Amino acid sequence: MLTMKDVIREGDPILRNVAEEVVIPASEEDTNTLKEMIEFVINSQDPEMAEKYSLRPGIGLAAPQIGISKKMIAVHVTDTDGTLYSHALFNPKIISHSVERTYLQSGEGCLSVDREVPGYVPRYTRITVKATSINGEEVKLRLKGLPAIVFQHEIDHLNGVMFYDHINKENPFAAPDGSKPLER
């Protein structure tokens, strides 16, 4: 079982590397790692489990965050309309995105970042992601709102990008041009 001890923190060079593609069909080892990742995210949202194992609540996790430089992500997030998006994916890739941008009014956080980083993180409002599911099936997901933001955040990790790299350094709270805020 993964715990916060397994989550590496900013400053570790692996978080700045471009992760490797996972060979499909995935090995048993990669599949088990991905299972542990989604289990961690789900457990972190369960108050009892989070307290018992000192887990920081999270809605997504990328393999580089646990020291594995491979393209794997786990996301477990509920949209504003109550729809649950729970996915454990190999080799996720954004294949299209909207012109319209958004940002979380409260800013973004990260399990690998133990400090508050103030500022707006510009994201695409809608994205389409292509990936391979944990069961080995090709999937294509059309996402908008919070799930789209979470997927962009996790896919950034696979490319060595941290959320705060997107924040305007001169004016952290400048709303990105033509964007609409998303409240969480």
Swiss-Prot record:
The active site is at E154. It catalyses: N-terminal N-formyl-L-methionyl-[peptide] + H2O = N-terminal L-methionyl-[peptide] + formate. One of its GO terms (molecular function) is metal ion binding. Its cofactor is Fe(2+). The keyword Iron applies. GO terms for biological process: co-translational protein modification; translation. It holds the Pfam family Pep_deformylase. PANTHER family: PEPTIDE DEFORMYLASE (PTHR10458), PEPTIDE DEFORMYLASE 2 (PTHR10458:SF8). Removes the formyl group from the N-terminal Met of newly synthesized proteins. Requires at least a dipeptide for an efficient rate of reaction. N-terminal L-methionine is a prerequisite for activity but the enzyme has broad specificity at other positions. Disulfide bonds: none annotated. Keywords: Hydrolase, Iron, Metal-binding, Protein biosynthesis. Binds 1 Fe(2+) ion. InterPro entries: Peptide_deformylase, Peptide_deformylase_sf. This is Peptide deformylase 2. Its EC number is 3.5.1.88. It comes from Bacillus anthracis.
